[in-house]
A protein has these predicted regions:
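N-terminal glycine-rich FAD/FM-binding segment characteristic of electron-transfer flavoproteins
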Residues: 1-263
Length: 263
C-alpha cells in the first residue's frame, strides 16, 4: 500500500500573529510548525504502515525552508519526502495550491492520500477536497477514526465527524481523507529517526515537474481569490468579577454600562 500525506509548514499562531503591509502573514516573525491536522493525518498513515507495511511519502508545497517539516515527518517514520517549491508558485490561494499539489501527486503511485482538514494559517478546509476533485478521487472529510482498510477488496471504512455525531463511510481505494487533529495523538520523533531522516535525500520539484496543470492555474496569477484586508483580532482585557448581593450587583453593572454609553 502506498500512502501520500500532504503536510504544510505553518506559523505557530498561539502567541499571536503579525501581518505584512500587503495583508499577508509575516511568517519570519513567528515560529514554524507542522500543521496540527496534517500531523494527525501523518500519524494515521504511520499506524497503517505499522499494521500493513505501507510506504508513506510526505509531500509539502512552500519555500525551501519547508523542508523542515519533511525531515520531521521522516523522523517520525515516513519513508520519503517531496518538496514542491518554485517562485512562480508563490502567492497561491486554495485553488492554485490544490492545482499545484495535484500536479505533483500525479507523479506518484498511491492507494490513499491523507491531508489535514484545514491549516491554522487559513482555516478554509478547501485544499484537500479540491485535490480530490482534480484527481477524480472520492473524498471523506473530517475523518476522526479509521475503522478498517481492506487491501484485497480495496476499500476503507472511516468515521466522519458530523456535528456532535458521526457518519460511518465506506469508500473505494484510491481515495482521499481529510483528517481532524482529534484523529489520534501523533508520536514523537526518536533519536534514531532524526538521524535517519537527515541521512535521506529530499526530492525537490518545481513548476516543470507538475503534470497536467496549466500556468493559468498556478501562483498569484492563477488565484481567483486574494486577500483584501487582514488584521489581528482585538484582544480583550481581563474581566471584572462582582461579588455583591444581587440588587447591588445589578446597580453596579448598570452603572458600568452607562459609563461606557452602552445604555
Amino acid at each position: 500500500m502506498n500512502i501520500l500525506v500532504c503536510v504544510k509548514q505553518v506559523p505557530d499562531t498561539k502567541g499571536g500573529v503579525k501581518f505584512n503591509p500587503d495583508g499577508t502573514l509575516d511568517r519570519s516573525a513567528m515560529l514554524a510548525i507542522m500543521n496540527p491536522d496534517d500531523k494527525a493525518g501523518l500519524e494515521a498513515a504511520l499506524r497503517l504502515k505499522d499494521q500493513y507495511g505501507a510506504e508513506v511519502t510526505v509531500v509539502t508545497m512552500g519555500l525551501p525552508k519547508a523542508e523542515e517539516v519533511l525531515r520531521e515527518a521522516m523522523a517520525m517514520g515516513a519513508d520519503n519526502g517531496v518538496l514542491v517549491t518554485d517562485r512562480v508558485l508563490g502567492g497561491a490561494d486554495t485553488w492554485a495550491t490544490s492545482q499545484t499539489i495535484a500536479g505533483a501527486l500525479r507523479n506518484l503511485d498511491y492507494d490513499l492520500i491523507i491531508t489535514g482538514r484545514q491549516a491554522i494559517d487559513g482555516d478554509t478546509a478547501q485544499v484537500g477536497p479540491q485535490i480530490s476533485e482534480h484527481l477524480g478521487l472520492p473524498v471523506i472529510s473530517y475523518a476522526q477514526k479509521i475503522r478498517e482498510v481492506n487491501e484485497a477488496e480495496k476499500y476503507i471504512v472511516v468515521e466522519r465527524q458530523y456535528d456532535d455525531r458521526y457518519h460511518v463511510v465506506k469508500a473505494q481505494l484510491p481515495c482521499l481523507l481529510t483528517a481532524l487533529a482529534e484523529l489520534n495523538e501523533p508520536r514523537y520523533m526518536t533519536p534514531g529517526g532524526i538521524f535517519d531522516a537527515y541521512a535521506k535525500e529530499i526530492t525537490v520539484w518545481g513548476r516543470k515537474d507538475l503534470k497536467e496543470v496549466e500556468d493559468s492555474n498556478l501562483g498569484l496569477k492563477g488565484s481567483p481569490t486574494q486577500i483584501a484586508k487582514a488584521s489581528d483580532k482585538v484582544r480583550k482585557g481581563a474581566g471584572e468579577k462582582v461579588e455583591l448581593d444581587p440588587a447591588a450587583s445589578a446597580d453596579y453593572i448598570v452603572g458600568k454600562l452607562a459609563e461606557k454609553h452602552i445604555i
